[in-house]
Amino acid sequence: MALQYEDKVPASYRSGFIKKVIDISEKLKINPSWLMAIMYFESARTFSPSKKNGIGCVGLIQFCPDKGKNYKTINGKQYLMSDISKMNYSEQLDLVYNYYKTYSGKLKSYTDTYFVTFFPLAIGKPDDWVIQGGGLTASQIYKSNPAFHQVKDGKIRVWEVKKKILENLPTEWLNEGTVSLAVKSYKNYIVVGTLSIIAGATLFYYNYGRNGSK
């Protein structure tokens, strides 16, 4: 079974990329298509580990530098942004896994997985919670993320992010319940076995400036 957007991965490293995404997703206990969707849109539809945005974030999930620094801290280790941008796909997928691994087994939807990528402090918060913290004010986050402007009052709430995401939900992901995906093994683009995952996931396009809160 093909993963979401796997045909968009550059052919030169597609097979190895997909295999590694599946391996990572099994460890994280998530649907590998969620991770594929995040990387596709975060990298501006390129799956390039060197893709940069306008405010210094780089890579497959747009790693953002720590505030005022030239490095990104992940699980206590500092990674120079210049080094992250030079990583090949395999090296950076290892970093992607390191970023998510503390949430292994806790991500029950695409929305959960996206909030880990976008603003972890928002995970588990009520829909009316104003997104802020981590050294960033609500106003700063608002200005950096116009895609989520619903009320347009200088702040972004959790429900505004969800609403934007749901606007781009593909019809095949609308069904709730347990979905069976073939992810046990991957050989010559043939995946066999099953992984039980929670559906009701979402896709959306997001390629605005990031707030650096990851």
Show the residue positions of the predicted features.
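Catalytic glycan-binding domains that act on GlcNAc-containing polysaccharides
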Residues: A2-H149, D153, V161
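Intrinsically disordered, highly charged
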Residues: M1-D23, K27-K29, E167-S185, Y208-K214
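Single-pass alpha-helical membrane anchors
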Residues: V183-S213
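Active-site or metal-binding loop neighborhoods of secreted/extracellular toxin and effector enzymes
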Residues: L136-K187
